[in-house]
Amino acid sequence: MATVVMEQIGRLFINAQQLRQIPRFLESAFPKLPCTVMVSDVPWVFRESHIITGYRPPDQNWRYYFLTLFQRHNESVNVWTHLLASLIILVKFQELSETVDFLRDPHAQPMFILLLAAFTYLGCSALAHLLSAKSEISHYTFYFLDYVGVAVYQYGSALAHFYYVVEEEWHAQVRTFFLPASAFLAWLSCTGCCYGKYASPKLPKFVHKLFQVVPSGLAYCLDISPVLHRIYRCYSSEHWCADQAVVYHCYQVLFFLISAYFFSYPHPERWFPGRCDFIGQGHQIFHVFLVLCTLVQIEAVRLDYTERRRLYEHLHGDLAHDAVALFIFTACCSALTAFYVRKRVKTYLEEKQE
């Protein structure tokens, strides 16, 4: 008996010794990263209004920037909010694929496009905030990729709203132009953001913001119109609105408007410079509410897909295939535009170094 006890104690001692080696192992696996730096230590293009500390030093190797996923810096919250949200979208897709036949049901394709578009914009955004600090050309490249993701999501949202959410009366008003106009405005949004970023050294801050906000605002006004009409119809009827999907659509609009405010205005860091460098930035709040908007939007579309099938089959017929083709066309045009503007940026940076 004593021998058995001693063996158990010996094993515990060995396990304790192994546990002590874990921090050393983690330190070797994740080497100590350079400390973050002040705003004065990074080039102008990396600087954010009213954010003073927490910048990552440029011109490090790629491994460093990937490992900063686990470091505290002023982009950490921005990276993790959209990274975690993109994983939630994958889980949502897996859950929906158990009951929805995305391959053989053409009427499920717009919902698949919405899920793909949401995952794309969230993934591109997470990459931009994680890797853009490496160099000036990396900064422009990854944010242009982010803008392509935004354009893709804008069209994906427009398609889902038009296909599943629209009422018959509104469909009759907009059916001839809604999807082509949504595709054009999505591309215009990408173009405006890319050009605004490219020309930002020569533009006042508010003009740079206008290039981002105005095209996206126009796109949103069109894309959300089926949702607003549906909400109006539901709550203006004589009977109390009992449509659960409409409740989710109301939250979708509310969360988007809150996110748009914090995207447009640098609050609260403007009121407390240096106090919101790591957490509490307006852009971080924008990320959180945009994620909430996307998640309730997907839930609303799921309900509409399930409960309004007779209506959208009657309204759209075999439109889904054309809508998917337009999605691919919009994504390609946006990507080509971003590639062209990146080429202009690269030429500009090379001339600046000479």
UniProtKB/Swiss-Prot annotation:
Cytoplasmic membrane side: 1-76, 132-141, 197-244, 299-318
Topological domain spans for side Extracellular: 98-110, 163-175, 266-277, 340-354
Membrane topology: Multi-pass membrane protein
Pfam families noted in UniProt: HlyIII (PF03006)
GO molecular function terms listed in the Swiss-Prot or TrEMBL record: nuclear steroid receptor activity; steroid binding
Coiled-coil parts of chain: none
GO biological process: adenylate cyclase-inhibiting G protein-coupled receptor signaling pathway; oocyte maturation; positive regulation of MAPK cascade; response to steroid hormone; signal transduction; steroid hormone receptor signaling pathway
Chain ranges passing through the membrane: 77-97, 111-131, 142-162, 176-196, 245-265, 278-298, 319-339
Main location: membrane
Entry's localization field: Cell membrane
Stored PANTHER family: ADIPOR/PROGESTIN RECEPTOR-RELATED (PTHR20855), MEMBRANE PROGESTIN RECEPTOR ALPHA (PTHR20855:SF41)
Known role: Steroid membrane receptor. Signals upon progestin binding, resulting in rapid activation of MAPK and down-regulation of adenylyl cyclase activity. Interacts with steroids with varying degrees of affinity, showing specificity for activation by the maturation-inducing steroid (MIS) 4-pregnen-17,20beta-diol-3-one (17,20beta-DHP). Capable of mediating progestin-induced oocyte maturation.
Name of this protein: Membrane progestin receptor alpha-B
Taxonomic path: Eukaryota, Metazoa, Chordata, Craniata, Vertebrata
